[in-house]
Amino acid sequence: MENQEVVNQLAGFEVKVSGQPLSKLPEDLYIPPDALRVFLEAFEGPLDLLLYLIKKHNIDILDIPIAEITRQYMQFVDLMREMRIELAAEYLVMAAMLAEIKSRLLLPRPVVEEENEQDPRAELVRRLQEYERYKKAAYDLDQLPRVGRDTFIADAAVPPMNTAKIHPTAELPELLNALKDVLQRASLYNAHSIAREPLSIRERMSRILSLVDKENFIAFTRLFTVEEGRMGVVVTLIATLELIRQSVIELVQAEPFALIHIRAKG
């Protein structure tokens, strides 16, 4: 009887002994009740088990035969119990869910409710599809190169090098000649430092007023000179703004984007 159970469990699997296919167990084969069993499949949860059963039998995930899947699922649960393997509570919860879906599909339903009622398998299909996406993403991440598994950091110590230091030999006359040559080359480069004349904002204000008094109406650009550089631009601009603040001069413009002029205010 126990041998027959083993045969039933091997149904659907191709078993070979010494390279030859085995369709049935020898008649004189005795398998003790507590014989060693090797279970090769490992699942991360009930959804993983269901996905395995669906792929194993090439079942369309959108059209799951609940009765057949429930039967195979319960066979796995019973097998785990026979092998005294502790099952997580989530496996039993999934078994109850499958039984509920199976009963809802078998019970007759009114025509009105049948048109509006959602397929009892819809929630299970959604969870399976979502789990399959996460499982594929985890597999893709696992295939990425990983330090310590696929690549290893080289940790090779540099062998000690015992090399003798060779000190250069130089005589005093040679050093004096080298120093003389350096001094001669240094004398060829004479540096000249040129100090700029400091610019005064007060003086620039007086200069602007003098120009305005002479011509009464001058272009703003005439206040600046190229020779004074950026410092001259800054000083002239500050002086102009200070005179405008004191209401001594004003800026005028005939039209937008036209040339700006300065004239005395009043």
Swiss-Prot record:
Keywords assigned:
Cell cycle, Cell division, Chromosome partition, Cytoplasm
Protein's name according to its UniProt entry: Segregation and condensation protein A
Q: Name one GO cellular component term.
A: cytoplasm
Q: Name one GO biological process term.
A: chromosome segregation
Compartment annotation:
Cytoplasm
Report the gene name.
scpA
This protein's record includes keyword Cytoplasm: yes
Quaternary assembly: Component of a cohesin-like complex composed of ScpA, ScpB and the Smc homodimer, in which ScpA and ScpB bind to the head domain of Smc. The presence of the three proteins is required for the association of the complex with DNA.
Protein family according to the UniProt entry: Belongs to the ScpA family.
Q: Which HAMAP family match?
A: ScpA
